[in-house]
């Protein structure tokens, strides 16, 4: 389940990056 957790974290980070672009 560790791999799945890492995948979810990575997806969450990408999701945040898409809607919160750097200034």
UniProtKB/Swiss-Prot annotation:
Signal peptide: none annotated. Its main location: secreted. It is found in: Secreted. Transmembrane segments: none annotated. Can form homodimers. Interacts with IDE and INS. Interaction with INS inhibits homodimerization and fibril formation. Amylin/IAPP is a glucoregulatory peptide hormone that plays an important role in the regulation of energy homeostasis. Selectively inhibits insulin-stimulated glucose utilization and glycogen deposition in muscle, while not affecting adipocyte glucose metabolism. IAPP function is mediated by the CALCR-RAMPs (AMYRs) receptor complexes. Amylin can also bind CALCR receptor in the absence of RAMPs, although it is more selective for AMYRs. Belongs to the calcitonin family. The mature protein is largely unstructured in the absence of a cognate ligand. This is Islet amyloid polypeptide. It comes from Lepus europaeus (European hare).
């Amino acid at each position: 389940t560790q791999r799945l957790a890492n995948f979810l974290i990575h997806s969450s980070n990408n999701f945040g990056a898409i809607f919160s672009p750097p200034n």
